Amino acid sequence: VLGDLIIADDDTIYTTDSLTGVLYRYSVSDKEFSVVVDSGTFVSPQGLVLDVGGKHLFVADYVGGLHCVRLADGRVERITSPDSINTYGIDGLYRHGNELVAIQNGIQPHRVVALALSDDGLSITGSRTLARNLPEFDEPTLGTIVGDSFYFVANSHWNSFDRNNNLPDGLSNPIILKLPL
């Protein structure tokens, strides 16, 4: 099941398979997929974002926290953080300068945080909570950064699907929220 994807400046597409844990690279010119990180490293890769130079890919593993993948050789390093900063349950991941903006819908209460990266990008040095436990939240997920603002879906209703993948009648319309960064 292909999940999140990101397009690099050279039009290479990176995407995750949230069921097998594989990270793929898709060459637009060759129209072919190749494996960057095979199954066994990630449990449920979700959010993806490139570093400023496009040489590393930050991967949010819903169960395993944050990782940094060196794109040249596929080497994976776990991003460390102080015990006081939780990096689990991240669904959406975005970059704003030297911060990773993360939607955490796998922990309670749901929240949106900005995680400050070290200069080498391999550790979290601090965090800011941008939004937490808002009344509009019903599985917040997916967003985008425009300038110094973060727009995201506050109520994906992801947990409302029944076992046949149907949504019940009467759900509220999607709510898009904007947060200053």
What are these regions (language model features)?
Residues S18-T20, V28, D61-V63, N105-I107, ...:
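Short loop/turn segments immediately following the C-termini of beta-strands
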Residues P82, I90-R128:
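Active-site/pore-lining binding-face segments in mid-to-C-terminal subdomains
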Residues A114-D119, N166-L181:
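Beta-propeller blade signature
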Residues S27-K31, R70-R75, A116-G121, P180-L181:
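Short loop/turn segments that connect beta-strands within beta-propeller blades
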Residues V1-Y14, G40-H56, A60-G64, S84-Q104, ...:
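Beta-rich, blade/repeat-based domains predominating
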Residues V1-F33:
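Hydrophobic alpha-helical segments and helix pairs
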Residues E32-S39, R75-D83, T125-N133:
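A short beta-strand motif characteristic of beta-propeller blades
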